[in-house]
From Swiss-Prot:
Pfam families: vATP-synt_E. Keywords: ATP synthesis, Cell membrane, Hydrogen ion transport, Ion transport, Membrane, Transport. GO terms for molecular function: ATP binding; proton-transporting ATP synthase activity, rotational mechanism; proton-transporting ATPase activity, rotational mechanism. Belongs to the V-ATPase E subunit family. InterPro entries: ATPase_E_C, ATPase_V1_Esu. It comes from the Archaea. It is found in: Cell membrane. This is A-type ATP synthase subunit E. One of its GO terms (cellular component) is proton-transporting two-sector ATPase complex, catalytic domain. GO terms for biological process: proton motive force-driven plasma membrane ATP synthesis. It comes from Halobacterium salinarum (strain ATCC 700922 / JCM 11081 / NRC-1). The keyword Ion transport applies.
Amino acid sequence: MSLETVVEDIRDEARERAKEIRADADERADEIVAEAEADADDIIADAEAEVTAEIDQEREQQLSSAELEAKQMRLEARRDALQSVRSAVEDRIVALDGDEREELTRELLDAASTEFDGADTVRVFGRADDEALISEILDDYDGYEYAGEYDCLGGVVVESDASRIRVNNTFDSILADAWENNLKAISARLFDEEQ
């Protein structure tokens, strides 16, 4: 074997080895590129999922906020309607006159007077416009006197030093109790709801 043949064999081996190294390097480079592309796809998918989740969350928050605002507006409209009804009732109570007003005032005074049996002096307060009516009714009660004005729709507030009791039998207090006890029914009827 000549030196040239040996050199040629070494060169062939070196070429073969270089070819293998290049093939391994190309294969490894392809693997690295594939991994990088897969990682990039995962990163993009994660980012898209995160953005989608944020968009969904923002949409839900805006929807919830809008629903809450609408509910508050409905409740406010209901409150306004109920207040309007109550104001109308108060106006009708204030407008009561004649025998009907006298009968109701007398019943409220009778109910209050049971708390003051045996009291020497009983003071009765009422609406300024009802002074004459209350004074006339008090003529039937010994020891009772009209003591002045009380800001109310009608009825009486009765008190005595002897018993240290004050009874509020005004139309306002009766209306407040009736309103509270029947608010659900009033609301249901006003807004056509089933109870």
